[in-house]
Amino acid sequence: VVKSFSNSASCIITDLFPLPPWTQWVKNTAQSATCPVIEVDCHCVIPMTLFGKSVDRPFKFRDATKKMRKRLVQQSWPENDITVPKYDGELPFNPVDVEKQVANIENRYKLLVDCSIDPTVFPIWRERGGEVVSLAKWQRFLDKNLSSYSRRRNDAADPKGVSRLSAAFHYGFLSPMKVAREASAVGTKSAEKYLDELLIFREHAWHHVFSTDTPYCSSNLPHWAIESWNNTSDDPRPVILS
């Protein structure tokens, strides 16, 4: 589908995701496309292409990026007044009529059967995705729970002590730039700690992965983790959960 569109598109803009197989997919598309292919870092306030180095401790990443982070964290997205013509060409796939095919529960299951989805993994019905739900979840946390984040975040039994927005960031339902900008405007100790987790510990990992050619290799783990792993390799494991 992407290859078909790349032959008629004026420009391809995609998410910068620095892990195989996505990196190779983008390279293949760029080689065959007849138009520019642009990757945009939608994960980090400090773009991976701007820093993109590996440092062995989060506090070193914090110090190395302090000036850039201060400049970018409260920077709003530029507003562009652009009118894009609607695509009316032939589609290289069979489109889904959401109102007719997804609204009906039987048709919905028929669509799922056609997808490459493991049916033995059951959905978590109480969790919903999408931009609207994610924005509402962030707003609730911002209004009611951010003020107590530094005190409650380490209590695993407290479901409201943290934002629970990792999935929203991962699947692109919610921009971490928006969250960072709005949390930064609060200016409290809890907001500062939340930003520390969001912008230091989280982005430190993204930049490390971007900098290495072997992101899945165990050598990316710290020495203490590898040592612990090796020391317990012979431990009995009657059940392997994988």
Which role does the model predict for each range below?
Residues 54-232:
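Glycine/tryptophan-enriched, flexible segments
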